[in-house]
Amino acid sequence: QZKRPPGFSPFRK
């Protein structure tokens, strides 16, 4: 998994 910022939801709109 790539390191993402906290609270980041790419699949949530």
Curated annotation (Swiss-Prot):
Assigned keywords, A-Z: Bradykinin receptor impairing toxin, G-protein coupled receptor impairing toxin, Hypotensive agent, Pyrrolidone carboxylic acid, Secreted, Toxin, Vasoactive, Vasodilator
Where on the chain is Pyrrolidone carboxylic acid found, per UniProt? 1
A single Gene Ontology biological process assigned to it is: defense response
One GO CC term on file: extracellular region
Superkingdom, natural source: Eukaryota
Query: Is Cell cycle among this UniProt entry's keywords?
Result: no
From the Swiss-Prot or TrEMBL record, give the protein name. Answer: Waspkinin
**Which species is this record about?**
Parapolybia indica
